[in-house]
Amino acid sequence: MKLSLSPPPYADAPVVVLISGLGGSGSYWLPQLAVLEQEYQVVCYDQRGTGNNPDTLAEDYSITQMAAELHQALVAAGIERYAVVGHALGALVGMQLALDYPASVTVLISVNGWLRINAHTRRCFQVRERLLYSGGAQAWVEAQPLFLYPADWMAARAPRLEAEDALALAHFQGKNNLLRRLNALKRADFSHHADRIRCPVQIICASDDLLVPSACSSELHAALPDSQKMVMRYGGHACNVTDPETFNALLLNGLASLLHHREAAL
């Protein structure tokens, strides 16, 4: 699996791995790259079955497999210890990495994540699946911003959204791969073993997230033994895109604090 690695800003700089959500594209993190690369070696990637890592995914594709293939790719690149920043599905992959490879994951940042899929989130995906079946990729892509962004943010950026739609259609991961990744997301359940995650965790959520209620992050916070929760009042599901200034400050402060906390505990 292909990874994109930034040059380390100094010798032995900590590594931060960015894991996007269901869309799978590493470019999702573009608003964070410049600030992160000043202090960390940053790893981005298109998830298997998407973008520049094309593949046909098995019907039983799982979050565990997503975590394993990423860890193997990191080890092959010479990276054995790393912090993880995961958004939604990416946060699930991050938790799986922390469970399966505890010696490797130094810190986890969960952005609009959850323990197990909430009934409201499931309802949103049911609607989106019906759109996919009835209207194909175009209907899926055109509806997606409604679940990602606040209405006023979208209304002020209509040309940008049209350009994003065209790009998403041109690089659509395919119906079968999308549904198999979505099914992996829906099956994931960390409610019975989140307390085994021992690395420090920062939880970031947006109170106006339409897709994943912020209560899901409260449940995560209660379940994770070494966690802190930060709530953004605005930004929607893709709060790192819509309000990068606020998000980046939380992210940078969280990484610095938790990595120091981890080092002090060793």
Curated annotation (Swiss-Prot):
A Pfam family hit: Abhydrolase_1
Alphabetized UniProt keyword annotations: Hydrolase
Matches recorded under InterPro entries: AB_hydrolase_1, AB_hydrolase_fold, AB_hydrolase_sf, Pyrimidine_utilisation_RutD
EC number: 3.5.1.-
Superkingdom per UniProt: Bacteria
Keyword Hydrolase: yes
Described purpose of this protein according to its UniProt entry: Involved in pyrimidine catabolism. May facilitate the hydrolysis of carbamate, a reaction that can also occur spontaneously.
Family designation: Belongs to the AB hydrolase superfamily. Hydrolase RutD family.
Protein name listed in UniProt: Putative carbamate hydrolase RutD
Protein's organism: Escherichia coli O139:H28 (strain E24377A / ETEC)
Lineage: Bacteria, Pseudomonadati, Pseudomonadota, Gammaproteobacteria, Enterobacterales
